[in-house]
Amino acid sequence: MKAFTQHTGLVAPLDRANVDTDQIIPKQFLKSIKRTGFGPNLFDEWRYLDVGQPGQDCSARPLNTGFVLNLPRYQGASVLLARENFGCGSSREHAPWALDEYGFRTVIAPSFADIFFNNSFKNGLLPIILPEAEVDELFRQCESTEGYRLTVDLAAQTVTRPDGKALSFEIDPFRKHCLLNGLDDIGLTLRDADAIRVFEEKHRQASPWLFGAIK
């Protein structure tokens, strides 16, 4: 998993509340369990005018030119600004996969659905909760300023605006540690691989009858 330490990026404002996971990545794209290939289909039903299908060449599809991610000023955005209850709906890790592959490193919102919130941390995407008044001000500044960028410092737990004002956010210490060090569940397990092997060998010697059928 990619570590997250500090990131400065262009902000795209998605001014919609209760964005659900089927809107983030529609159900027809969930047939694959690979973590790649979902970026072109992020917000598929909003980005395009047709109905997308798995494996389709998205470069030839008709665009919804009014959708925020299709506007020239937001091309290359890596910070998504959203409204309350972002990521509600069914559980699917494909949602953070799609956001990550598109290029987003972090999503800032007043609140998130719990399952999406947890899945994001496990896949290297940083969900940041800020008070609604602060999010409102970020929307105002972003929409009135072309090229609006924010700096997220995970170690300091701050989001810094272009005017220098730093906004503080809370994060669970363990999740912070994992993101700073790029540790997902597999990475955490592999970090203790030597200790696991030692335990298994001691267990085998203490209870050999449990391993008689194992070759």
UniProtKB/Swiss-Prot annotation:
Its EC number is 4.2.1.33. InterPro entries: 3-IsopropMal_deHydase_ssu (IPR004431), Aconitase/3IPM_dehydase_swvl (IPR015928), AconitaseA/IPMdHydase_ssu_swvl (IPR000573), IPMI_Swivel (IPR033940), LeuD (IPR050075). It catalyses: (2R,3S)-3-isopropylmalate = (2S)-2-isopropylmalate. Keywords: Amino-acid biosynthesis, Branched-chain amino acid biosynthesis, Leucine biosynthesis, Lyase. GO terms for biological process: L-leucine biosynthetic process. Pathway: Amino-acid biosynthesis; L-leucine biosynthesis; L-leucine from 3-methyl-2-oxobutanoate: step 2/4. It comes from the Bacteria. CDD domains: IPMI_Swivel. It holds the Pfam family Aconitase_C. One of its GO terms (cellular component) is 3-isopropylmalate dehydratase complex. One of its GO terms (molecular function) is 3-isopropylmalate dehydratase activity. SUPFAM superfamilies: LeuD/IlvD-like. PANTHER family: 3-ISOPROPYLMALATE DEHYDRATASE SMALL SUBUNIT, 3-ISOPROPYLMALATE DEHYDRATASE SMALL SUBUNIT 2-RELATED-RELATED. NCBIfam families: leuD, PRK01641.1. Belongs to the LeuD family. LeuD type 1 subfamily. Catalyzes the isomerization between 2-isopropylmalate and 3-isopropylmalate, via the formation of 2-isopropylmaleate. This is 3-isopropylmalate dehydratase small subunit. It comes from Azotobacter vinelandii.
